[in-house]
């Protein structure tokens, strides 16, 4: 059985390697917007690193079709429906009610469930994935993939300027305002007999002034149009090159130390366009359906490895709706305890979005997600502050050590069978 102790001892050097590589990509390559040239260039570069520096016999660059603008496009659909519903309130309230219901439907499908319901409305582009595998020397009994997404997020101007509390507060106000208007529209429709009319104080003063009261939410509705900036892409150093290089650093260290496993294949999945609604991971699962069913295959999916206080395993993902694999999740927690690093049992909460772990789990893979960020938004999340000079080497080193130990434990169990 392989001895991984030197890899764990050299975790600081591994973290420094990650920082240097991440800095190189951020400074010297195009911005990695989902479905754009920068994503492809970075994937091709990392695929080359995996082949030449990490010893992967297989390092495939793969493409897929997507509509990346659709993921945040629900904002335009939903908010426009709400504003139109507010106007309709004064003339045909039942139409306003229907518009707002449709707006919420768009939000739930695109963001709540990460479905592709409205993707067809947005331009098609080509995203990029990478699948790399280091073969074992003997019979294949198991396989471990380390995963990260190479694309970077579009800038969130409100979070960038005012911070996460203001960003989240605006969303809460908008949702509450839209719900208030929706039920007010239904009530107004019932009171007015579902007929077209011009609502005035003389017709029904209570219904009229409730409509006027809804105008207080209008500035917040318009603010939602600026909640993301599709013309500006951030560096994405933490989110999510930190995750891409977690697996790459492990494979490079194994090669440097001359470690070859007898029964465990070790691979890296770089799933593009995560910021566009897990589109790369979803495409990867479709393209590789059944390919890795031959032996136990685990996926450790990393995202935003930055803050050691929040380093944790997400037992639930996708707004808390999708269960991660308990065995894989527990294995990372066990490894953390063995190397003496604090790791939290956590989840991606409602309205917290999702990581690629959710897409793998939904496709039937044994997968878990590992993150190290505060789910109460920090000012570096999806902003220009997520830069190569804002990395946390200590957190990278600790997460790396846990991942190495988890791989060692998996290999020991598989090899003993």
Regions found by a protein language model. Give the residues of each.
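N-terminal hydrophobic or amphipathic helices/low-complexity stretches enriched
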Residues: 1-38, 47-58, 72-73, 134-135, ...
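Second-shell loop/turn segments in exported
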Residues: 5-12, 29-37, 118, 231-238, ...
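Soluble non-cytosolic domains of exported or imported proteins
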Residues: 12, 16-19, 33-41, 241, ...
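Extracytoplasmic/secreted proteins, especially bacterial periplasmic and envelope-associated proteins
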Residues: 17-20, 24, 41, 45, ...
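Active-site-adjacent substrate-binding region
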Residues: 30-31, 63, 305-417
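A non-catalytic alpha/beta surface segment that caps or lines the substrate-entry region
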Residues: 31-135, 157-206, 344
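Acidic/histidine-rich catalytic neighborhood of metal-dependent amide-processing enzymes
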Residues: 103-131, 139-142, 152-157, 188-214, ...
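Short beta-strand element of the alpha/beta-hydrolase
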Residues: 143-147
